[in-house]
Amino acid sequence: MENLCIKDILQILPHRYPMLLIDKVETVEPGKKIVAYKNVTFNEGFFRGHFPHEPVMPGVLIIEALAQAGAIAVLSLDEFKGKIPYFAGINKAKFRKKVIPGDTLKLEVEMIKLRGSAGIGKGIAKVNEKVVAEAEIMFMIG
């Protein structure tokens, strides 16, 4: 599947404003990998307090964006359509650079394990092809 717009994303993910952190999907191989994007704007509510004079996207929200991208890849499988993805854990999270208003986050997630309704995805977030964050995300599908 390629080039999913926001209408397509809303049919796959259960997340809605203000927690929907995916704007576009470039490509997805169901159950295997995905490349998605989040456009970061100054209008994001979290910038009011993080930080008022130097807005920086919270690292936990970058991880959440990676998790949502990975969820699209898994929820695109027929057996998981319409289900809810839940965080089960995070390993090896690293934050390398700040993400600020005007940035476009490129979210790449590859499933490294998928057994039954649980799995692990390796996520890498980039801005201008430079790694800004990475993590292994464990999840369960309910």
From Swiss-Prot:
Keyword Lipid metabolism among UniProt keywords: yes
InterPro entries: FabA_FabZ, FabZ, HotDog_dom_sf
Superkingdom, natural source: Bacteria
Classification via CDD domains: FabZ
Record's subcellular location: Cytoplasm
GO CC terms: cytoplasm; membrane
Record keyword 4Fe-4S present: no
Family matches, as Gene3D superfamilies: Hotdog Thioesterase
Keyword terms, alphabetized: Cytoplasm, Lipid A biosynthesis, Lipid biosynthesis, Lipid metabolism, Lyase
UniProt GO molecular function: (3R)-hydroxyacyl-[acyl-carrier-protein] dehydratase activity
Family membership: Belongs to the thioester dehydratase family. FabZ subfamily.
Protein name: 3-hydroxyacyl-[acyl-carrier-protein] dehydratase FabZ
Organism (species): Clostridium tetani (strain Massachusetts / E88)
